[in-house]
Amino acid sequence: MSDQSSFQPLNILFGSACNLKCGYCLQQDGTPKVNKKADLNDFILKFWDYLDRTNKKFSSVHYWGGEPMLYWKRIKEVYKLIAPFVGAKRHRITTNGTLITKEYVDFCNNYSDIFTVVSFHDGRITDDKWRLIGKLNHFSIEALIHHKRVSPLMLRDDYERICDLMGKRPPIGFDMIKANDGCHSDYWMTEEDLCDYFASMVLIYELANIKKDPFCQAVIAQFLYRYRKDLKYKGIKPNPCVNNHILSIDLFGNTYNCHHNNSPENITGNIFNPDFIPPKPISFNLSRFSSTTDCRNCKTYPSCGGGCYTSNTHEIDCFYYKTREELAKLWLEELEKHERETSRIRQDLQRP
């Protein structure tokens, strides 16, 4: 295994079971090793020993399915037993929202370090569930941009309806799908799709600044936040997801290249057994994009890191990241200029 001395985020994979079957899901078909029933007490004892041996601390812990609500009892137990020891400021659960219960909401609201990300999957969440989700103290909504939904504006009316149901305006963000083998090609983005997407983002930016539209302001805020976040870390490592700064494990201690694929072919080792040899050879070329001369010489590399190593549409991804950076830099410059001018005017008004 690689040196783990600089791990920061921790991904824990509980299984791949899900109550939905979305065509754009990144999990690939097969019978993942992660789905075997693990002994929680055994996992906790071995994980505590791992922390003691390595003196590891993690900046964040992410709990993954499948659909995490199908594993909620196990997730809750693991959280309670590891949270005091891992040093994480945030524990994040990403769910499709359809199975959230009052017990889940009440539990999360008792712990300020638990953050819930609710994935919007084409209106499958009922109004009653949205009202319940709205009672969470810490959550956001995320949706995907894909071939069948090329503009955030296509969800604007849904978002406003959800806000009315909740009586609040949660943060909302949009990510482009990753066109790996798990995602059906019907959802893969084309260059024309991206042109339409960025045209809509320009319109959203204008509506956010001129009309002060709250939905558009939220979309732009997340767009810029994600760009700045990517800029901080993607270009300094060999792959955006696979590196010595992220640990992805299942309840047996198996380590994975990334949390988006928990198939046996993606197992790289085991934190409980350093001598463990993966049962199947790794079938992914982790650096097929990120280590190429074209990627490393590209001015966009610091914010994309070469893109996803599982992508089947690398050229489209490249076009996305380059255009995103062009717009983000322009909008950030305008924002900084506005802040400087506003600060200057305030100072002038304070002078005698």
Q: Predicted segments — roles?
A:
Residues 8, 57-59, 243, 294:
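Exposed loop/turn and edge beta-strand positions of beta-sandwich/beta-sheet ligand-binding modules
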Residues 14-21, 67, 295-302:
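Cysteine-centered iron-sulfur cluster-binding motifs in ferredoxin-type domains/subunits
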Residues 20, 69-70, 100-101, 148-150, ...:
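Flexible loop/turn segments at secondary-structure boundaries
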Residues 25, 103, 307:
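Residues that scaffold the ATP/ADP-binding catalytic core of kinase and kinase-like folds
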Residues 171, 180-264, 303, 352:
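A C-terminal junction/extension of Radical SAM enzymes
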Residues 254, 260-352:
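Flexible mid-to-C-terminal extensions adjoining Fe-S/redox cofactors in radical SAM and related proteins
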